[in-house]
Amino acid sequence: MKFFALFIYRPVATILLSVAITLCGILGFRMLPVAPLPQVDFPVIMVSASLPGASPETMASSVATPLERSLGRIVGVSEMTSSSSLGSTRIILQFDFDRDINGAARDVQAAINAAQSLLPSGMPSRPTYRKANPSDAPIMILTLTSDTYSQGELYDFASTQLAPTISQIDGVGDVDVGGSSLPAVRVGLNPQALFNQGVSLDDVRTAISNANVRKPQGALEDGTHRWQIQTNDELKTAAEYQPLIIHYNNGGAVRLGDVATVTDSVQDVRNAGMTNAKPAILLMIRKLPEANIIQTVDSIRAKLPELQETIPAAIDLQIAQDRSPTIRASLEEVEQTLIISVALVILVVFLFLRSGRATIIPAVAVPVSLIGTFAAMYLCGFSLNNLSLMALTIATGFVVDDAIVVLENIARHLEAGMKPLQAALQGTREVGFTVLSMSLSLVAVFLPLLLMGGLPGRLLREFAVTLSVAIGISLLVSLTLTPMMCGWMLKASKPREQKRLRGFGRMLVALQQGYGKSLKWVLNHTRLVGVVLLGTIALNIWLYISIPKTFFPEQDTGVLMGGIQADQSISFQAMRGKLQDFMKIIRDDPAVDNVTGFTGGSRVNSGMMFITLKPRDERSETAQQIIDRLRAKLAKEPGANLFLMAVQDIRVGGRQSNASYQYTLLSDDLAALREWEPKIRKKLATLPELADVNSDQQDNGAEMNLVYDRDTMARLGIDVQAANSLLNNAFGQRQISTIYQPMNQYKVVMEVDPRYTQDISALEKMFVINNEGKAIPLSYFAKWQPANAPLSVNHQGLSAASTISFNLPTGKSLSDASAAIDRAMTQLGVPSTVRGSFAGTAQVFQETMNSQVILIIAAIATVYIVLGILYESYVHPLTILSTLPSAGVGALLALELFNAPFSLIALIGIMLLIGIVKKNAIMMVDFALEAQRHGNLTPQEAIFQACLLRFRPIMMTTLAALFDALPLVLSGGDGSELRQPLGITIVGGLVMSQLLTLYTTPVVYLFFDRLRLRFSRKPKQTVTE
């Protein structure tokens, strides 16, 4: 009593306290960062190594394996995967959530250093690492195009000037430059001309290497001067290499131009990038795992004018893709939803109280509680994101509930003629414990979420803490500011209501009277209600088992990502044509705004595409509907597939795949894996629950297998080293010399001119100069035949691995797909030597599925413990918790009705319902106990009176919560796919709960009261608590 009086009778202090809370909240709001979701990125580091010309199997055994053994010993590595292809190896390390990325980077560097002595000596550079996840979609893509500069020159500008500058911006983890390669002098040799002149490829390589040398020459001094010595020992351009003498034949000089075509070109001609059908260089920017995407994008945009000034005017630098506009639009939609929810909740209060003066009180209490929460969010290091803003939206209903309970009870005393200050004090005292019970039990619901580990726990923590803080501040405001305002603002008389609202008042009275009559009937037929209650419990179990489930709602971020997978024997020229064909199909779609893509590099038969869709208000279809429409058109392209998926804000794992979900096959027997992977993939491709099934196992690439006759080689005076060097010189785009420039270093690349390697007969033109100086054709000591060979070799840990990726067809859920895959693996009878497991997001879904029921039970148990402590009773908490089954049925039925799978967002809705619907029972039980203690009423009379007296606040709080969640259901625009499952769950649960709990709660109350009397040692005492 004294606590409440302290604030009621000191209005200035109470107002200033509320002002202080509001000001702190405003300050916190201004400093809060903006993000799509809470920070849930796993720390990921990518290690890259190269050995030009080495086969995938060689890269896997000689480069990947030594690095994996060293890297696998790092503390905190949760997953290690690698992929080795022609000349390159990439190892992805995913660390535990609590692992500091910078500390992990230091350990990675130490592990690379430890493995260095085990790596091949011919590697052009040491392995490097990047603190970025290559499977993440870029947060921004910049393109460089020009009508005057070559692709190599554009790539040089991008990699030398732009990428290093962008990499230094806070939050940027990696800038990947694609679409071409650095400028280079390319030497295309003519095998026949070399044979005619008696010049070997090694002779050419040695001559070029010796002619382009950068060595110190020293200085010359006399008594008074000093001169640095400088020579023309370097060759910079193709024109300077052309006249280089490489050999003498019969006294005549053989120049490089006589036996080769020398051009200013690029290091790797098997690269291509495009934007909207125009050749382009792409800068794909990814953020650090812990970085804020909006802040990083804003920093890049602020730097762009400065970057524009560093490149020539003839080069066009454009933003081809930017993830931030849809994120900002989504957050704006949530903010609008929050404002609408507050307005609707205040409207509900006004309709029930029918007093503008009374309505002002919750209209002040709600903003103070919500704004004050921003200060706590800032102190906790949170951000303004979809989940935290949704928490505030839902908190509006909880916040106003506390104010309603206090306000309605004070208003009831005022209508009975009590003086305002006395009514404020008396009314607050009566419901103070009720408000405390509702708030503490509601916060208790989220305690298991705070203790939940892994990605789901990290994702839900901000939601739970934000909501809990809002409830805590609301509790303080409701017991201080609200009663003070009631005492000083309201009058001791019935409020004057407007004529147009009298009808609503009469309707409410009629509804209350009708409820009283029906309640009397129910209390005389309690067995029927008991059957209904048991039925809802059983229905909950059945609905939960049968409802489709997924991890997170499929988002429409306005960005699509596509992976191209072509025939494994396709040439680069044909692959570039496929890229152009696919880009044209997509660019012609009316919902597409921009298309960029690239192909080439170490994997000639693959490519990537990034598609920006038009804003949501300019298209009628969702991203998934657009994908479904494009899938049919793309399927008509022969010899290649383009797998599209909508970019999501949450992507787990470091695997680069062509679809959203992954299923990984592991085996210590590579032959068994290669035998069973095609069988499993083909089986999964027939399942209706899966779409776009594809695999990263590519072991059917075309290979030309050369077999040396070692005896013949020995007789001819040729060793294997010379023969291998011949092949590398001819076909390996061998980098044989370095050109040093002030801003960068460039290579001299030697190979047989592509004009002479159009078919297999090119091998017949190759020859080696033996130790006697004779030209020996390759065909004299080697035979060759076509064969199959892997284009890539993949590992997970130290086991051979193959990852099957898949998307979900429209109308299918991840639980449907998971169950179908498990059935297929059982039907196939896959041996124990091949192990299958879900990976990435699908793996997290499996883990979440296993913990969902435990989490709900833990929340209910926590609420029971808190209520039991508050009521000093084992029984009354059960009465209060009896409201939950009906809410669960309503929520699950609503999800089924709206065709929405049960996701992590729906789980939040269920947890919220545990907190919301028990409020009705708390208000009934509190007043019933009070009536039994002080009114000398029987349990049936007490609960009946409590139900009627609390009917108005119960209706008010329920409708406030209902109207609070309704904008989430009805919201459209960006991010609505995240908000709708939460709103659907809450609205469905509230509607069903309100219909049933007004009757089941009094029945359960009486049931437990009779049960207690039956087993009580003091049968005359009806209420002991």
UniProtKB/Swiss-Prot annotation:
InterPro entries: AcrB_DN_DC_subdom, Acrflvin-R, Multidrug-R_MdtC
Bilayer topology term: Multi-pass membrane protein
Keyword list, A-Z: Cell inner membrane, Cell membrane, Membrane, Transmembrane, Transmembrane helix, Transport
Keyword field contains Chloroplast: no
UniProt subcellular location: Cell inner membrane
Name assigned to this protein: Multidrug resistance protein MdtC
Gene that produces this protein: mdtC
Main location: membrane
Molecular-function annotations in GO: xenobiotic transmembrane transporter activity
Transmembrane segments annotated in the record for this chain: 3-23, 333-353, 360-380, 387-407, 431-451, 463-483, 528-548, 853-873, 875-895, 897-917, 953-973, 984-1004
GO cellular component, one term: plasma membrane
Subunit and interaction comment: Part of a tripartite efflux system composed of MdtA, MdtB and MdtC. MdtC forms a heteromultimer with MdtB.
HAMAP family, sorted: MdtC
Similarity annotation: Belongs to the resistance-nodulation-cell division (RND) (TC 2.A.6) family. MdtC subfamily.
Superkingdom classification of source: Bacteria
